[in-house]
From Swiss-Prot:
It catalyses: GTP + ATP = guanosine 3'-diphosphate 5'-triphosphate + AMP. Residues 237-338 form the HD domain. Residues 65-84 are annotated as: Disordered. Signal peptide: none annotated. GO terms for molecular function: ATP binding; GTP binding; GTP diphosphokinase activity; kinase activity. It comes from Arabidopsis thaliana (Mouse-ear cress). This is Probable GTP diphosphokinase RSH3, chloroplastic. Belongs to the RelA/SpoT family. GO terms for biological process: guanosine tetraphosphate metabolic process. The gene is RSH3.
Amino acid sequence: MVVATTIALYASPASTVCSTAHQINAHISCDLDLNSRSSSASSSTSSPTIGGLSLLFSGASVKSSSSSSSSHPSVGEELASIRHDRSEDRTLSGSFCYSPSKFIGSSYLKRDHQSPVSVLHGPISSGNSPPMRISRDRNLDGGSALRVGSSRLFNGFVRKAIGSCVDYDTDSVLVDEQLPFTMDDGFEGERRQPYARDLLRRAQLKHKIFEDESVIKAFYEAEKAHRGQMRATGDPYLQHCVETAMLLADIGANSTVVVAGILHDTLDDSFMSYDYILRTFGSGVADLVEGVSQLSKLARENNTACKTVEADRLHTMFLAMADARAVLIKLADRLHNMMTLYALPPVKRQRFAKETLEIFAPLANRLGISSWKVKLENLCFKHLHPDQHHEMSDMLEDSFDEAMITSAIEKLEQALKKEGISYHVVSGRHKSLYSIYCKMLKKKLTMDEIHDIHGLRLIVDNEKDCYKALGVVHKLWSEVPGKLKDYISHPKFNGYQSLHTVVMGDGTIPLEVQIRTKEMHLQAEFGFAAHWRYKEGDCKHSSFVLQMVEWARWVVTWHFETMSKDGSSICSSEPLCSFPSHAEDCPFSYKPSGNQEGPVYVIVIENEKMSVQEFPENSTVSDLLRRAGPGSSRWSMYSIPAKEELRPRLNQTPVSDLKCKLKMGDVVELTPAIPDKSLTEYREEIQRMYDRGLAFSRPHRAATGTMVGWGS
């Protein structure tokens, strides 16, 4: 007992500077009224609806020049992601693609929501959408392997980015009757609701990460938490949780992020508390869910009509974004809400879309997640300008020449083979409606005057082949002067790299051709995930902390940039510099300066946890330590003063003068250390406890006649 008590003295909970006054408690309803509550049964009685994510995220039906296994595409796949490739890297060609492998008649394309741009016509609930294609060698009774989507999309590159657990080569689908854990509160017998079981199985068919024990447990915890809750669409609330998590899995998020995605609304909309999630899933998941809750509260209360209030809430939002993974979850949550926005009244749709276009779409853009950025912008465009969206959708559909795209793909493939240039994918694509709309406004053009609406995308092995392929393209078709853009040598602000050229295709129709490597494509589609690879080499901190510091510095910059804008155009979302670096002439750089006015934002690291904290102008390191709490005021669980000192390091340099002023973007590390005087006091206190223990045990042994010793 004495030994255990002595050891416990050095295991008292660490101080937590990270949980500052800027944390926000949020326990009210979710974003706007999208998630209406109902006391009706959890299971939905609505008829199956084909669409939604099956259109947006399904892989394509492809004709491979290699001998790859054939598959059975779903209806959504045939409509939304039709393309042509020659490898198993089938998801490389993007969201909007055409293919010569399957011809669809024009009458079929002109049916409701069945055009090549049907993904832009508005979201449809995907609760009963068919799963992704299953290869023919799949024995549905449990025999052979299941292959869903691309088997190699996240191998290596994105997997290293944020610890991806995505694996498309799953041997089996774990059914809920075989759970490797036991649910609490007698939930084991209640969990077999058909809609929940089917929802989990569909998720498992698409992503193996949904077979992870923690993910399955989170699924059933979310089902229990949201049971009886219905969304405005009429779907069970659990469906939104799973769709959000599936969006995260699509970009390679690991199990911690996916679990937090499933649970992201439990703090605001259920009986669950932070402590409950902490006990059940650990601090990593609990902190992420709390971070998403903070962002959700700010989004709910944001009033874009009042610039002063908006500025205050935006800068608080930035402070809440210390963990970038929470932002990923919030972006996925917002994307799925936008996909089901049709269920809200028109006024609320407009307000929700305006906020998304002003805050969340630019955020996805700056992080380089182009697939999410495009979807958010197009959905906002649909609800903010429905007439223009409808008119441009019809024009884009009418201008689509499937035969021309098919011919161009085949022609380019033959030329590449003749030159001995290997490639992964050749696919058709078109410019997003919102991008076309912005270009028309900016350059005062008609839709017919824009040359890069339709085009091809070519994915090759390496950078050298990019330039070789460019030469092949210019031999096949005549180049439009002044339209060549080399983003490989001069990347865009968010790290985007590619070669762009415009040529006159067959029939004198302008055709934009994009050429990039597989790595460049993954960077373009999942920029944030692709960028955050774990760093190698000798580091004083864990790679995760270093990444968080980069994120915090970038947040500080974006704060100043956003606050400096005086009502910019809705189409101008391009920042001056890319995450996490800064351009040399960037006026919002975090480089320390002596003439800083207004509040100062400082990155604080303690016990490998990081927070972004706001301090008044002219604050010092001493002020920061005072906020952290003096050592003499900290008490351990044994009522012994925890007199450790916080030894600060400012930008990796020990601080000798506590009156040193803090500057924008400073990194302050707080390292606890026990001074010599306190060590002496600890030893004396331990000795006194030991003596009291001996004094108590001697009369007790004498009374009972029991021999107690340290050894045998």
